[in-house]
Amino acid sequence: MAGYSVKLTKLIKEYHLEQIWVPENLDEIVIETAELNRPGLQFAGFYKYFDPERIQIIGKSEFGYLSGLSREKRLEMVDLYFSKQPKVVITTWNLTITKELGALGEKYSVPILRTSEGTSEFMAALTVSLSVALAKR
């Protein structure tokens, strides 16, 4: 039996997510897992258990880590991350998206969205919503 899915556009509307960069096929992107990921370990180079199907949530900790890297190293790590083509990247706390980050979203066709909500609150609400929508019936 096929699993359930939620259109990314539904989540954008439900959570009033700002679209920083989105591909032309935005209406075709579906989320099929309630699992979320904060990519701090990926920015440090660890990909062993990385699942690009998960919604990626970038908050203050991830931005803080990246800002501590040299520009060259930061670009290298973020390019590697986007090359894995995560389903969608959502930043929290209304964090400023650099032109570099936006360009990598476009380069790898990865939607980049933003919310003004705090990371924990947003993740909790999103997890509940996805768990209900994707639950076995």
Predicted stretch roles:
Residues M1-F82:
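Gly/Thr-rich phosphate-binding loop signature of adenosyl cofactor/nucleotide-binding cores
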Residues F46-I57, S61-K136:
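Feature captures the catalytic cores and cofactor-binding loops of soluble hydro-lyases/lyases
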